[in-house]
Amino acid sequence: MEDLVLDNNTKNIYNKRFFISTWGCQMNEEDSEKISGLLKGIGYTRTDIRDEADVVIFNTCCVRENAEQKVYGHLGELKALKRKNPNLILIVTGCMMQQKGMPEKVMEKFPHVDIIAGTYNSYKLPEYIERVKTEGNSIIEIWDKEKGIVEGLPVDRKSDIKAFVTIMYGCNNFCSYCIVPYVRGRERSRDPQNIIDEIKDLVSKGYKEITLLGQNVNSYGKGLEPEINFATLLRMVNKIDGLERIRFMTSHPKDVSDELIKAMAECEKVCEQGHFALQSGSTEILQKMNRKYTREDYLTLVKKLRKAMPNVGISTDIIIGYPGETEKDFEDTLSIVKEIEFDSAFTFIYSKREGTPAAKLEDQVPEDVKHTRFNKLVEAVNEIMARKNKEFEGKTVEVLVEGPSKNDDTKLMGRTRSGKLVNFNGCLDQVGKLVNIKITKANSFSLTGEII
């Protein structure tokens, strides 16, 4: 493990503002919280107005092509701003930059970019900013591989109630469509005591809910001495006084052990919720994806989860249009969605990622077929979600109050233990508290209720 030591000559920046935009998963969100913490630590303040910032940071994603296109669009927009303010420092970091050849491509197309960093060295951004200011030259700094885990980074968290805590980095699964192992590196786990200490510190500051993060949390502990597994870590976190709720993601279906399900059911602070990415309901497609489980394996997992926790909320990811997907394969996916009845599902059209095995496959599904299947799947998912939400009407649920509703600032919002979003009337002094809500109305993607 490596502790961060900030160079003292970077601590001389005052009255400067930074703007950060984040694409991608919760891991990226937590990375941005750390970047924000680092910059605040050297005197910067954060602004939500991009055009008034002295430093603009794009923390990028490359899981799908659409995310990359958005970054290109924003970089193009900043050309005029850079011309207007030559002292503006523009930074691009994250997964997109870790791809082979991408930094050079971005710098060639957008020469007004000042700093390009990858996923392994974003904690060095304060140093890079200082170098640009003193030397005046652009910086491309991409590390080929991880250099251990950096502990002790300052974190500027978005919420005062809930926090992400990363427990491991990287992925060893190499699903055939996925770029993540190539840009996030091999699996490496944090020391359990460092995780416990971080959570205890958060609880002492008033945090009530922790989400344990990893590309595959089920692989946690491999390679540590003494070896520990994720189920054991869950039980350790569950013992922390003052912590109310524990969630985790992402969890690979093939690695969900009976021991983990038992821990989820027995640990009273672990919420009855899990995100288990199905990706396809066709065993043939799952094999091509290198997912290492079958349709029946996934159905068995769901049965085990629901037997152990009858009220468990199960969410998933589904990819439509993987190379070679036939109409039968799609119907297999549609039928398993209807059989399981997920509480929510994130659905995606397959996006070809250069450098992955799937990108070399020739049997690509026509775009119009992809979209037809996608629309049919989304319709089924939404119908199931609306129907399952309807079942909550008249029931009383426990909700952790998170703050004002995003859609109606006259209301408060929070989530049930199973992950359902609930909006209700209340007072701001209830933020951070657990309250009982009677559900009065079910909406397509949320619930409405009243405090009892």
Curated annotation (Swiss-Prot):
Annotated membrane-spanning segments are none
EC class, as a word, reads: transferase
| Domain MTTase N-terminal span(s) in chain numbering | 16-134
Location relative to the cell: Cytoplasm
Catalytic activity field: N(6)-dimethylallyladenosine(37) in tRNA + (sulfur carrier)-SH + AH2 + 2 S-adenosyl-L-methionine = 2-methylsulfanyl-N(6)-dimethylallyladenosine(37) in tRNA + (sulfur carrier)-H + 5'-deoxyadenosine + L-methionine + A + S-adenosyl-L-homocysteine + 2 H(+)
Q: Where is the Radical SAM core domain?
A: 157-387
Question: Per the UniProt record, which EC number(s) apply here?
Answer: 2.8.4.3
Q: Where does [4Fe-4S] cluster 2 bind?
A: C171, C175, C178
In terms of Pfam families, this protein maps to: Radical_SAM, TRAM, UPF0004
> What SUPFAM superfamilies does the record tag this protein with?
Radical SAM enzymes
Task: Name the protein family.
Answer: Belongs to the methylthiotransferase family. MiaB subfamily.
Assembly notes = Monomer.
Entries under NCBIfam families matching the protein: miaB-methiolase (TIGR01574), MiaB/RimO family radical SAM methylthiotransferase (TIGR00089)
Free-text function comment from the UniProt entry: Catalyzes the methylthiolation of N6-(dimethylallyl)adenosine (i(6)A), leading to the formation of 2-methylthio-N6-(dimethylallyl)adenosine (ms(2)i(6)A) at position 37 in tRNAs that read codons beginning with uridine.
The identity of this protein, by name, is: tRNA-2-methylthio-N(6)-dimethylallyladenosine synthase
Question: From which organism does this entry originate?
Answer: Clostridium novyi (strain NT)
